[in-house]
C-alpha cells in the first residue's frame, strides 16, 4: 500500500485518516529492542495485544508493560503501566502511538506471526 498519493501534506494526512482498517495495520510498526532484533533478524514488527513494550516518549517514558488493547481506528495502543484517573475517579489506560514504543518481548503464540517474521527476515 502506498500512502504517497501526492506531495501535498493535506492529502498525505487525508490518506492516513481515510485508510481502511486492514491497511492501517501497517501504521502499527514498532521498533524491536536491539537484542530481540538480533535474535529474530527483523528490525520492526506490528504491535499486538500481549507484546511487552517499553514506552520511549511522553509522560510515561521508561514504563514497561504488556499491551492490553490495540485501537486500529485511532492508531493507538494501551499499555498496562500507563494509566491515569478520569474525572469520575476511575483508572483508565492512556492511549499511546505505536511509533513511541519499543517492543521488548514478542508474543509468538500465533503461527501466522512466526511466518511473518520468517518472511521479513534479513537474508
From Swiss-Prot:
GO terms for biological process: cytoplasmic translation; ribosomal large subunit biogenesis. InterPro entries: KOW, Rib_uL2_dom2, Ribosomal_uL24_CS, Ribosomal_uL24_euk/arc, Ribosomal_uL24_KOW, Translation_prot_SH3-like_sf. Keywords: Ribonucleoprotein, Ribosomal protein, RNA-binding, rRNA-binding. Belongs to the universal ribosomal protein uL24 family. The gene is rpl24. GO terms for molecular function: RNA binding; rRNA binding; structural constituent of ribosome. This is Large ribosomal subunit protein uL24. One of its GO terms (cellular component) is cytosolic large ribosomal subunit. SMART domains: KOW. It comes from the Archaea. Part of the 50S ribosomal subunit. One of two assembly initiator proteins, it binds directly to the 5'-end of the 23S rRNA, where it nucleates assembly of the 50S subunit. Located at the polypeptide exit tunnel on the outside of the subunit.
Amino acid at each position: 500500500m502506498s500512502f504517497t498519493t501526492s506531495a501535498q501534506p493535506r492529502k498525505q494526512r487525508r490518506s492516513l485518516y481515510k485508510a481502511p482498517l486492514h491497511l492501517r495495520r501497517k501504521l502499527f510498526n514498532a521498533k524491536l529492542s536491539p537484542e530481540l532484533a538480533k535474535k529474530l533478524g527483523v528490525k520492526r514488527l506490528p504491535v499486538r495485544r500481549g507484546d511487552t513494550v517499553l514506552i520511549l516518549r511522553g509522560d510515561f517514558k521508561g514504563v514497561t508493560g504488556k499491551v492490553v488493547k490495540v485501537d486500529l481506528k485511532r492508531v493507538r495502543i494501551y499499555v498496562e503501566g500507563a494509566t491515569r484517573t478520569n474525572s469520575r475517579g476511575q483508572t483508565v489506560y492512556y492511549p499511546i502511538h505505536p511509533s513511541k514504543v519499543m517492543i521488548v518481548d514478542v508474543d509468538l503464540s500465533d503461527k501466522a506471526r512466526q511466518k511473518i517474521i520468517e518472511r521479513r527476515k534479513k537474508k
